[in-house]
Curated annotation (Swiss-Prot):
Glycans are attached at N304, N419, N545. The keyword S-adenosyl-L-methionine does not apply. It is a single-pass type I membrane protein. One of its GO terms (cellular component) is plasma membrane. GO terms for molecular function: calcium ion binding. Residues 31-133, 134-242, 243-347, 348-452, 453-562, 570-675 form the Cadherin domain. It is found in: Cell membrane. Residues 713-930 are cytoplasmic. PANTHER family: CADHERIN-87A, PROTOCADHERIN GAMMA-B6. Residues 791-839, 900-930 are annotated as: Disordered. This is Protocadherin gamma-B6. The chain crosses the membrane at residues 692-712. Residues 920-930 have a biased composition (Basic residues).
């Protein structure tokens, strides 16, 4: 394949491939398809049915993408019919200039499979140009002595049309002195000349005017005219004579402009003015006059422009030598241009694939191109080659047409595009070459799965993070392009509950950012694992998974919680009893606290914030153990209070406080009075609520009393006097062994008085007797449930009727004397009957109270947890404290039927006055405050 661009180093395989590829190129090796059309054909005119001439059906036109290509595209193919249509204006004179034969070469390209067919369109000339004279006014001179038959040369007209449409004839208007003769030269050109018919007489007529008309051979013919003015001069009988009738010279096309080409010379045997010769171009094409210049005096011809053998191979001109007397003669000059290897080969891409799939098999055609060299002979023979380290190679089809095909596997991820440089070199000396680079883009297929940046991810997230905050980001890459490389992220697995994953975390499908959907709690969830998936959008889709472990870090968000000492169910505080004889270092109690945090945030330390007696107790910094720092002194109070702070090790640290109530006593009996008289801090808001409730209760009680009084009065009127006989002494008294003789059965009128303190505990006032009783009076039964009747006569009942319906004021002091106070078991004075129960009742009552306290503390309903009248006992005092710890309890017991509170012995030691008899009873704590 002489002009092949194939790579010579692979000659062996190509000898095998050539017979296989020959059928593929066979259509391009056949004779070209020829069409002939006239120039100036209208746009859209049909040149011929190209599809039919190629043997293609109408369906193949669009299916195989039939099209034509050329340097200057004057034609197009109808996509429906396959007709070859005129696309642009076709002017033969502009396209082919002075060439006699005008042809346009096209390449018809079809695909599936890819083939090329040669098409030649011959452009026929039409008479679209009229003849034209260079000068509309022609001035000639002739001597009157000129003999008949003397000829005067005229400038010919020019017509760019050829053949029959070129200039056919000349004519002039009739004149007795001149006639027109047409001279035909060797190349068929026609040149007009005037011939003198008879002698001139200058004295008779000094000038002659003629009209010269040039006609072409078109149908209808076109014409042009020029005015000839002939002046008659005196005689000049010797015309100039050239040294040669024809000058011929060969010039290299590389001759620079302005170089001397040829000098013509003529001689005249006349003398004087008649011997002075001037040189002019005659009967020369306008393009030739532009290419050359002629010195009128010397006859030197020079080139004005560079020669180009590929455009014009030969120039022909006529040079006229005219003497001063008007006689002239002509010679012919022929200049031939010699071809030089001055044109580099051209590479013209006729078809190029936009993209090549990276899985394309070897041998796939990706581009079609051709080469052209305007030089002739060996200077115009071209061979092509490309680089050897790329997976492409070149096959030559025919007539300098080539195919660029794949020659190996393609991988877009390694090489997304190839810059293929085609080098064309001619066989001139020296050889010239040119190159053309084309870029081939490799189209992507989804052949790569996403790859994560890390094999696994571990992130640390502090608890209490804001919901919606980003806690991590995973990133995957996919070297594919477009949708094949577009990655979406999702959560596919987790060690959390399947339905709870979305409530804990979410992942952005676009960025891979993992967001927390809620605030994490280290104490509930310390770590969890996710499996994230990166999936591309290719077809089929490819994916990859990665594990993400989230470690929830601890924050100091939980304050220490004190387990001991704890408050009772009703809010009362426990007391710890310390023996009075406790030595320094004695373990009194231990503050127990926990912290839900971990690490340093849960490292607790204990500190004393406030102590009623500083220096009496010590507190373990880490253990929380409360020990005595020294022995109890005589001046130290029996009741001590410690305010302990428990701090954790977080930053900033959190703390909790606990209040320890410590009582120095050797037995429970000593601390019972203190438990009853604990001060209770007052709250202004609670006091306001208390007063409101008391006021409401008083109004209700007054209303109830009014209703009861009205009912009692109505019943009193309706009952007979015999009914009241029951109130006589002894009528209703029941005696028997059940009740000791000190007591009588009866009913006491009572009322409830409810007080609410800020601690939330409720205080119940015991029953209040409506009639004041003396310690030496017995109780008798009355039919009316409203009063207790003293044993007097009937006149007392009638004289004091208000005692039945009203409540007497309480005694100013219900304290017992020292003789009346009960002692230890078995020490009761037998003379004070009717005041205290016997010792058996005393023992059973205390045991029942302690057991009830322990039982109620266990189920959260204790009434002995420190409220009013409960002695401040709690569950922890129940089981371990028995009667042996309480030798005497009666000094702290409220006496039913009295508004006064029996003060304890400590109250007397403090010298406090007894409560007044106004009927308003306060809690012991409030009395101390006021």
């Amino acid at each position: 394949m002489g002009g092949s661009c194939a790579q010579r180093r692979r000659a062996g395989p190509r000898q095998v491939l050539f017979p296989l590829l020959l059928p593929l190129f066979y259509p391009t090796l056949s004779e070209p398809i020829r069409y002939s059309i006239p120039e100036e054909l209208a746009k859209g005119s049909v040149v011929g049915n190209l599809a039919k001439d190629l043997g293609l059906s109408v369906l193949d036109v669009s299916a195989r993408k039939l099209r034509v290509s050329a340097e200057k595209l004057h034609f197009s193919v109808d996509a429906e019919s396959g007709d070859l249509l005129v696309k642009n204006r076709i002017d033969r004179e502009q396209i082919c200039k002075e060439r006699r034969r005008c042809e346009l070469q096209l390449e018809a390209v079809v695909e599936n499979p890819l083939n090329i067919f040669h098409v030649i369109v011959v452009i026929e000339d039409v008479n679209d140009h009229a003849p034209q004279f260079d000068k509309k006014e022609i001035h000639l001179e002739i001597f009157e002595s000129a003999s008949a038959g003397t000829r005067l040369s005229l400038d010919p007209a020019t017509d760019p049309d050829i053949n029959i449409n070129s200039i056919k004839d000349y004519k002039i208007n009739s004149n007795p002195y001149f006639s027109l003769m047409v001279r035909v030269n060797s190349d068929g050109g026609k040149y007009p000349e005037l011939s003198l018919e008879k002698l001139l007489d200058r004295e008779e007529q000094r000038s002659h005017s003629l009209i010269l008309t040039a006609l072409d051979g078109g149908d209808p013919p076109r014409s042009a005219t020029a005015h000839i003015e002939i002046s008659v001069k005196d005689t000049n009988d010797n015309p100039p004579v050239f040294s040669r009738d024809e000058y011929r010279i060969s010039l290299s096309e590389n001759l620079p402009p302005g170089s001397p080409v040829l000098q013509v010379t003529a001689t005249d045997q006349d003398e004087g003015v008649n011997a002075e010769i001037n040189y002019y171009f005659r009967s020369t094409a306008q393009s030739t006059k532009h290419m050359f210049s002629l010195d009128e005096k010397t006859g030197m011809i020079k080139n004005n422009q560079s020669f180009d053998f590929e455009d014009v191979e030969r120039y022909t001109m006529e040079v006229e030598a005219k003497d001063g007397g008007g006689l002239s003669t002509q010679c012919k000059v022929i200049i031939e241009i010699l071809d030089e290897n001055d044109n580099s080969p051209e590479i013209i891409i006729t078809s190029l694939s936009d993209q090549i799939l990276e899985n394309s098999p070897p041998g796939m055609v990706v581009a079609l191109f051709k080469t052209r060299d305007l030089d002739f002979g060996g200077n115009g023979e071209v061979r092509c080659n490309i680089e050897t380290d790329i997976p492409f190679k070149i096959y030559s089809s025919s007539n300098n047409y080539y195919k660029l095909v794949t020659d190996g596997a393609l991988d877009r991820e390694q090489t997304p595009e190839y810059n293929v440089t085609i080098v064309a070199t001619d066989r001139g000396k020296p050889p010239l070459s040119s190159s053309r680079s084309i870029t081939l883009y490799v189209a992507d297929i989804n052949d790569n799965a996403p790859v994560f940046d890390q094999t696994s991810y571990v992130v640390h997230v502090a608890e209490n993070n804001p919901p919606g905050a980003s806690i991590a980001q995973v990133s995957a890459s996919d070297p594919d392009l477009g949708l094949n490389g577009h990655i979406s992220y999702s959560i596919v697995a987790s060690d959390l509950e399947p339905l709870a994953v979305s409530s804990y975390v979410s992942v952005s499908a676009q960025s891979g950012v993992v967001f927390a959907q809620r605030a994490f709690d280290h104490e509930q969830l310390r770590a969890f694992a996710l499996t994230l998936q990166a999936r591309d959008h290719g077809s089929p889709t490819l994916s990859a998974n990665v594990s993400l472990r989230v470690l929830v870090g601890d924050r100091n968000d939980n304050a220490p919680r004190v387990l001991y000492p704890a408050l009772g169910p009703d809010g009362s505080a426990f007391f710890d009893m310390v023996p009075r004889s406790a030595e320094p270092g004695y373990l009194v109690t231990k503050v127990v606290a926990v912290d839900a945090d971990s690490g340093h945030n849960a490292w607790l330390s204990y500190h004393v914030l406030q102590a009623s007696e500083p220096g009496l107790f010590s507190l373990g910094l880490r253990t929380g153990e409360v020990r005595t720092a020294r022995a109890l002194g005589d001046r130290d109070a029996a009741r001590q209070r410690l305010l302990v702070a428990v701090r954790d090790g977080g930053q900033p640290p959190l703390s909790a406080t606990a209040t320890l109530h410590l009582v120095f006593a050797d037995n429970l009996q000593e601390i019972l009075p203190d438990l009853s008289d604990r001060p209770v801090l007052s709250d202004p808001q609670a006091e306001l609520q208390f007063y409101l409730v008391v006021a409401l209760a008083l109004i209700s009680v007054l209303f109830l009393l009014a209703v009861i009084l009205a009912i009692a009065l109505r019943l009193r009127r309706s009952l007979s006097p015999a009914t009241w006989d029951c109130f006589h002494p002894g009528l209703c008294v029941k005696s028997g062994p059940v009740v000791p003789p000190n007591y009588s059965e009866g009913t006491l009128p009572y009322s409830y008085n409810l007080c609410i303190a800020h601690t939330g505990t409720k205080e119940f006032n015991f029953l209040k007797c409506s009639v004041p009783l003396h310690s030496n009076e017995d109780m008798v039964c009355s039919v009316s449930p409203g009063a207790l009747i003293p044993p007097h006569g009937g006149e007392d009942l009638t004289s004091h009727p208000e005692t039945l319906t009203s409540q007497a004021p309480p005694n100013t002091d219900w304290r017992f004397s020292q003789a009346q106070r009960p002692g230890t078991s078995g020490s009761q004075n037998g003379d004070d009957t009717g005041t205290w129960p016997n010792n058996q009742f005393d023992t059973e009552m205390l045991q029942a109270m302690i057991l009830a306290s322990a039982s109620e503390a266990a189920d959260g309903s204790s009434t002995l947890g420190g409220g009013a009248g409960t002695m401040g006992l709690s569950a922890r005092y129940g089981p371990q404290f028995t009667l042996q710890h309480v030798p005497d309890y009666r000094q702290n017991v409220y006496i039913p039927g009295s508004n006064a509170t029996l003060t304890n012995a400590a109250g007397k030691r403090d010298g406090k006055a007894p409560a007044g008899g106004n009927g308003n009873k306060k809690k012991s704590g409030k009395k101390e405050k006021k």
